[in-house]
């Protein structure tokens, strides 16, 4: 196995047995590919902006004299890069410029000739761009657009499962759902009449839509029914026999022919009888006249002489009409063939309740339903019906919809028109009748073949189209009214509606969400999330149980584990590891092809629809070396069910054991031993882990950690191979290998690292280099670790030594007892950065001013501010401290004589402003790490702003100069090589300044040319460098684009280090969560016979009932890993020979049964072995992939190899008494996370604060500085204790007795500790409420 440079530093021992067939795909591709489709010009016009433009353009004027045509579009350059947008609070977007052509026609009588053509590029608003990590920067914050799982367009057949009608009769319905346009529903009622609804309006008989499609009654009956033909011969009635139609009927007469009785009267006609009739080739039988009476004729019978209709179609035959027909010479009568079994008379019955009789009346009926109250005219009714389903502007099935529609109706062709036609509607009615007749089945709505994924690109395109349609109306009017000779395309297009539509989508759509940036995993999961909510999706309240449930088609597409707990359960899902969307938007998953029991390396992606036809083996099926199944019977899935199949029947096999789970769930080791509910919590809680100050890779991982860390984009990854030329905390410089260099470039890659930046969740983003000078690196290697990554692997928490035992009740109910050592070593210390803003506005009374001159504030409070009134960087501040001094002008007030006197003495400035400074919120403290000032264009910058500007300019100049020097020196190394090849003394060259090198006289022409070429390159480099500096300088010094009425914004960043403390929430990866109850001194913790104390004590009762046994296996294997690490550490300390070290490590990697990982340490140099050993001394990292992990016997082997008891339990001693505990205790290493539910953020106490307006009770919640609710049960508690005075003050002065609480305050100030409770305000509210009901209620004072 080939290891990359970073992987060689620390190899993870892999317990996986199944071969790796397919690498884990790039985890953010669903976002990036979708947006790429939207942005990139698509010549076919199927996707993205191109499709939107083509669907709206050309726009014709109402009079047809002119049209505006679309030619092409291009996206301009962005003004600010991603980081600048985040700092400035701007949107990362690019201007959209569209080339339009205005064509004006000369109207002749016969044809239109072109009179004039004008082409122009028009600005059409800004399009937000996606960053490389799949996010958008909207108003400075990073957002993610979540993909939506919605019902695919097409036709769906469903039933109410007998719930609608009291009789329990199953009513079937069909629904045609377009991508955009009106829905068309067909439904049966309990009387078996078929109805149609348009857009869920009032229902109409289905015949109305058929008449509107220009069918008359006869044609309708012809389409939907087979005919029985009766002939009148020799005064007898003869039926032309189709034997099949008699099945299941009871013979009401003897069925005989040529004297032979085939079926006796009263007998039920069976398949045997029918076969007999067929065998004897009986084509007709004589029937009694009663048999034809009551039958329904299928066409109109008209007297040819008089033109009188004797009997019209869909009418029952009676004896007299039969006589009439016979008299008039109609000797052949066609009737409808219906029966109760499989040919129901539904359409015929429906025609009877239909009041309309021709196309016009049907159209009027439809018009009345769609536009109630408007008078119908012929033209209006026809237009309305035409526009509903047959006009491309108003109705679009989309390619997906057409494909699903045709597949549902079992048609061969999957392509077709995007609107409906007559055949479509008739085929749907035929199919729903077939289903009612018992042929065919209803669809499963929750099948992933009926739900598709709409990603960012598609949603943005829909929004953009909405904007274009708004513009279209305005353009049409302009084209019709305006003076066309002077008009240019630019005058017609207003970009505002388009910008507004796009902005609204990215800013406030339910699916455009504030990115969850707790840690790299939460970022990746957020981008891979699939939601059933949102525009055109479900709502929480209406979503039933079925939609939320796991469906067999989720296998390998949507994770069955990771979904939120609470009201959104099952509506928000996560994409499985290998899943992707196909061109139609359906989720598909990869499988290996199997032929005659031989598993090939060929991989096919199947969607849920395609998968239904195949037999698919699981990933852990046993295969021999040649690729054949070893067992004759293999467990497989087929049509959503699991059972055993012969190995030669198998068509496909899973690609990997991790295929069914999402990224989050695939990070849980021993997931297969956890109960599903706990696994769900484990997957969700990993997303809440706060990045710790010191990262620590998990000892027990699953092998997915590297993929997550690299794909999330928080690490710096090498773009090209090369050598590390320079490295410091904020920059890495790589000298690129020559074979990867582009022509005429310096061959230098510079990676600037992110330092101590705030994330969306107020955690800290910081990158640290993990390479050293002179190291050779390959493309794709990790150069710098980001938050929660350690040597390019995801590291969300810390490996803790845990013991499962009770300890003095401190781990009752999932509490956690933690050793003080954890705090001392800063194991769970995290950094949190908060941003506080102060906005100075222009008010009616004048501008607000930021200054240190604040009324009624003492010197002490201003001690941390500079002369501009802004806090110093590095100042330590706590709740209530002023960060930015700001005064607001206040309106003139009537002054008291004393105030007038003071004004006269001290001048008037003092009191016409009020203090509105930015203060540190209560309960927050920290260090100021950065201040940024944004000033509106045209407003004078204060001293501090100019200082900050200077600093930024200096830093940028320094950075760019260093970059330039690096490029320059690289260039001069090339020149030096040229000189050396000419035998020129380089020592003399070194004394000359670089610029003089180009003027050295060289005789050889080719070399001279080369030097000239390099000189030109140097000149270009310098020009570019100066240009860059100028651009940056302009960006920094120009005014900022602030919201209307805002003059200045000052942003202050506070950082605070939080150590772990009682009340913080911690969790493992198996859903085992708890709150820290106590931080115990190290000396009191239980310790083993070597004197090593444990870090954490967990309650053993938390395991059996929760059934998350994975944590125990993790603990045991962690112990073994640490034990092996200790042995390596011992060998390093005693300076064992490297050969022995190599042997020992090799042995450790070879442990286990038929593993796929083959590590050959003989290929490693001695230095590499030493470096590996140093990284393994704290424990050998182990990977145990999901469903393919370490077995029990392998864990025992590891424990034995580490010299530990194979039971995993050891004797512990009580730290307080030194006595042995009475039985061995499970001790080992578990990976623990600190979750973002910190007690510091939740602690809250109210003194005096705001009150609710109506009830006059204190508000609730920390944000409102509210109180704690003293509820019904708490009142009972005080009553039970008989604490009447306490209860009285709780219900009055401490709550809503307005006068009482004011007096109380006064009494306390005066030192008089008495209270005078009065009437609680809520009692008055009750009185008012009762009076509002018209009951007069008054209090009588005694």
Curated annotation (Swiss-Prot):
Q: What does this protein do?
A: DNA-dependent RNA polymerase catalyzes the transcription of DNA into RNA using the four ribonucleoside triphosphates as substrates.
Organism, scientific name: Buchnera aphidicola subsp. Acyrthosiphon pisum (strain 5A)
Catalytic activity as recorded in UniProt: RNA(n) + a ribonucleoside 5'-triphosphate = RNA(n+1) + diphosphate
In Gene Ontology terms, what is one molecular function of this protein? Answer: ribonucleoside binding
Q: How does it assemble?
A: The RNAP catalytic core consists of 2 alpha, 1 beta, 1 beta' and 1 omega subunit. When a sigma factor is associated with the core the holoenzyme is formed, which can initiate transcription.
Q: Which CDD domains match?
A: RNA_pol_B_RPB2
One Pfam match, by short name? Answer: RNA_pol_Rpb2_2
Protein name (Swiss-Prot/TrEMBL): DNA-directed RNA polymerase subunit beta
| Enzyme class per UniProt | transferase
Q: Name one GO biological process term.
A: DNA-templated transcription
The EC number(s) this enzyme carries = 2.7.7.6
Single GO cellular component annotation? DNA-directed RNA polymerase complex
Q: Which NCBIfam families match?
A: PRK00405.1, rpoB
The family this protein is said to belong to: Belongs to the RNA polymerase beta chain family.
What keywords tag this UniProt record?
DNA-directed RNA polymerase, Nucleotidyltransferase, Transcription, Transferase
The record's disulfide annotation reads none
């Amino acid at each position: 196995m080939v290891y990359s440079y970073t992987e060689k530093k620390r190899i993870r021992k892999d317990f996986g047995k199944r071969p790796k067939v397919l690498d884990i795909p790039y985890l953010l591709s669903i976002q990036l590919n979708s947006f790429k489709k939207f942005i990139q010009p698509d010549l076919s016009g199927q996707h993205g902006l191109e499709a939107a433009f083509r669907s709206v353009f050309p726009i014709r004027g109402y009079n047809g004299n002119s049209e505006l045509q679309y030619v092409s579009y291009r996206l301009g350059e962005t003004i600010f890069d991603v980081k600048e947008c985040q700092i400035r609070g701007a949107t990362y977007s690019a201007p959209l410029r569209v080339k339009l052509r205005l064509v004006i026609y000369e109207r002749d009588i016969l044809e239109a000739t072109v009179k004039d053509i004008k082409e122009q590029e028009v600005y059409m608003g800004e399009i937000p761009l996606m960053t490389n990590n799949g996010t958008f920067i909207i108003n400075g914050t990073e957002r993610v657009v979540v993909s939506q799982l919605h019902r695919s367009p097409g036709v769906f057949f469903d039933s109410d499962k007998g719930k609608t009608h009291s009789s329990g009769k199953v009513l079937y319905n069909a629904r045609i759902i377009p991508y955009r346009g009106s829905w068309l529903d067909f439904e049966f009622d309990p009387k078996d009449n078929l109805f149609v609804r348009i857009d869920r309006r009032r229902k109409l008989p289905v015949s109305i839509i058929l008449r509107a499609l220009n069918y008359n009654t006869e044609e309708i009956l012809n389409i939907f029914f087979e005919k029985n033909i009766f002939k009148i011969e020799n005064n007898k009635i003869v039926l032309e026999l189709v034997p099949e139609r008699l099945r299941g009927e009871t013979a009401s007469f003897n069925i005989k022919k040529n004297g032979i009785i085939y079926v006796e009267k009263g007998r039920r006609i069976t398949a045997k009888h029918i076969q007999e009739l067929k065998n004897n080739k009986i084509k007709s039988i004589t029937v009694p006249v009663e048999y034809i009476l009551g039958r329904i004729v299928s066409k109109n019978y008209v007297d040819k002489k008089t033109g009188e209709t004797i009997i019209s179609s869909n009418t029952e035959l009676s004896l007299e009409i039969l006589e009439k027909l016979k008299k008039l010479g109609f000797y052949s009568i066609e009737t409808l063939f219906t029966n109760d079994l499989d040919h129901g008379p539904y359409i015929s019955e429906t025609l009877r309740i239909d009041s309309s009789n021709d196309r016009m009346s049907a159209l009027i009926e439809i018009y009345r339903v769609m536009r109630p109250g408007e008078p119908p005219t012929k033209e209006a009714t026809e237009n309305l019906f035409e526009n509903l389903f047959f006009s491309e502007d108003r109705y679009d099935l989309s390619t997906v919809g057409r494909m699903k529609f045709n597949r549902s109706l079992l048609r061969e062709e999957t392509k077709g028109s995007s609107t409906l036609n007559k055949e479509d509607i008739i085929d749907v009615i035929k199919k729903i009748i077939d289903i009612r007749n018992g042929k065919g089945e209803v669809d499963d709505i929750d099948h992933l073949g009926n739900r598709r994924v709409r990603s960012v690109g598609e949603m943005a395109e829909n929004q953009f189209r909405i904007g274009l349609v708004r513009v279209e109306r305005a353009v049409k009017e302009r084209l019709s009214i305006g003076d066309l000779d002077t008009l240019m395309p630019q005058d017609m297009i207003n970009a505002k509606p388009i910008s507004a539509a796009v902005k609204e989508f990215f800013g406030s759509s339910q699916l455009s969400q504030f990115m969850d940036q707790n840690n790299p995993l939460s970022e990746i999961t957020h981008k891979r999330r699939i939601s059933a909510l949102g525009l055109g999706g479900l709502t929480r309240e209406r979503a039933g149980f079925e939609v939320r449930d796991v469906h067999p088609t989720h296998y390998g597409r949507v994770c069955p584990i990771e979904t939120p707990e609470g009201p959104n359960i099952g509506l928000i899902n996560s994409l499985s590891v290998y899943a992707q969307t196909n061109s139609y938007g359906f989720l598909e998953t990869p499988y290996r092809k199997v032929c005659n029991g031989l598993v090939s390396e060929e991989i096919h992606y199947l969607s849920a629809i395609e998968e239904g036809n195949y037999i698919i083996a699981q990933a852990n099926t046993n295969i021999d070396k040649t690729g054949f199944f070893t067992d004759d019977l293999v467990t497989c899935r087929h049509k959503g069910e699991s059972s055993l199949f012969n190995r030669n029947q198998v068509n496909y096999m899973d690609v990997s054991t991790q295929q069914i789970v999402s990224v989050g769930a695939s990070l849980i080791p021993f997931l297969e031993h956890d109960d599903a509910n706990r696994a769900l919590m484990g997957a969700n809680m990993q997303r809440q882990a706060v990045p710790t100050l010191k990262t620590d890779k998990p000892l027990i991982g699953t092998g997915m950690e590297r993929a997550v860390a690299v794909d999330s984009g928080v690490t710096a990854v090498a773009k090209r191979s090369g050598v590390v030329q320079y490295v410091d905390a904020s920059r890495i410089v790589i000298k690129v290998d020559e074979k990867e260099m582009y022509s005429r470039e310096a061959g230098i890659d510079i990676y600037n690292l992110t330092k101590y930046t705030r994330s969306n969740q107020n955690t800290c983003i910081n990158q640290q280099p993990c390479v050293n000078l002179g190291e050779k690196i390959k493309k794709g290697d990790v150069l710098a670790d980001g938050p929660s990554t350690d040597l390019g692997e995801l590291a969300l928490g810390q490996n803790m030594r845990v013991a499962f035992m009770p300890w003095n009740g401190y781990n009752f109910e999932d509490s956690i007892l933690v050793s003080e050592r954890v705090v001392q070593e800063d194991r769970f210390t995290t950094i949190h950065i908060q941003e506080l803003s102060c906005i100075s506005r222009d008010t009616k009374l004048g501008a607000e001013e930021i200054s240190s001159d604040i009324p009624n504030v003492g010197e002490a409070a201003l001690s941390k501010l500079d002369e501009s009134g802004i806090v110093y960087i590095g100042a330590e501040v706590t709740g209530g401290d002023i960060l930015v001094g700001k005064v607001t002008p206040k309106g003139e007030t009537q002054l008291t004589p004393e105030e007038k006197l003071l004004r006269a003495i001290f001048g008037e400035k003092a009191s016409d402003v009020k203090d509105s400074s930015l203060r540190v919120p209560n309960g927050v403290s920290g260090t100021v790490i950065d201040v940024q000032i944004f000033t509106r264009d045209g407003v004078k910058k204060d001293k501090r702003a100019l200082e900050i500007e200077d600093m930024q300019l200096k830093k940028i100049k320094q950075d760019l100069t260093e970059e330039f020097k690096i490029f320059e020196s690289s260039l001069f190394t090339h020149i030096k090589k040229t000189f050396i090849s000419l035998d020129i003394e380089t020592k003399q060259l070194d004394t000359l300044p670089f610029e003089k090198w180009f003027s050295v006289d060289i005789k050889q022409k080719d070399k001279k040319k080369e030097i000239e070429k390099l000189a030109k390159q140097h000149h270009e480099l310098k020009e570019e460098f100066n240009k860059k500096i100028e651009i940056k300088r302009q960006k920094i010094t120009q005014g900022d684009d602030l919201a209307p009425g805002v003059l200045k914004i000052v942003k202050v960043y506070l950082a605070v280090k939080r150590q772990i403390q009682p009340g913080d929430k911690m969790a493992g990866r198996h859903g085992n969560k708890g709150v820290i109850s106590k931080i115990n001194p190290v000396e009191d913790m239980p310790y083993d016979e070597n004197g090593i104390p444990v870090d954490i004590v967990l309650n053993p009762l938390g395991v059996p009932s929760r059934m998350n046994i994975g944590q125990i296996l993790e603990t045991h294997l962690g112990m073994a890993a640490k034990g092996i690490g200790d042995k390596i550490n011992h060998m390093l300390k005693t300076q064992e020979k490297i050969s022995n070290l190599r042997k020992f490590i090799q042995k450790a990697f070879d442990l286990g049964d038929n593993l796929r990982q083959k590590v050959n340490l003989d290929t490693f140099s001695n230095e590499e072995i030493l470096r590996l050993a140093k990284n393994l001394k704290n424990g050998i990292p182990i990977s145990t992939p999901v469903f393919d992990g370490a077995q029990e016997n392998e864990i025992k082997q590891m424990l034995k190899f580490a010299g530990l008891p194979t039971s995993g339990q050891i004797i512990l001693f009580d730290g307080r008494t030194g006595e042995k505990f009475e039985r061995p205790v499970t001790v080992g290493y578990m990976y623990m996370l600190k979750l973002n539910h910190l007690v510091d953020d939740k602690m809250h106490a109210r003194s005096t604060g705001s009150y609710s307006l109506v009830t006059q009770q204190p508000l609730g919640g920390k944000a409102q500085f509210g109180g704690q609710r003293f509820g019904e049960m708490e009142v009972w508690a005080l009553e039970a204790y008989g604490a009447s005075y306490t209860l009285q003050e709780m219900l009055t002065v401490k709550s809503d007795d307005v006068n009482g609480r004011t007096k109380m305050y006064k009494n306390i100030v005066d030192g008089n500790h008495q209270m005078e409770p009065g009437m609680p305000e809520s009692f008055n509210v009750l009185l008012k409420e009762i009076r509002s009901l018209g009951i007069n209620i008054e209090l009588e004072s005694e």
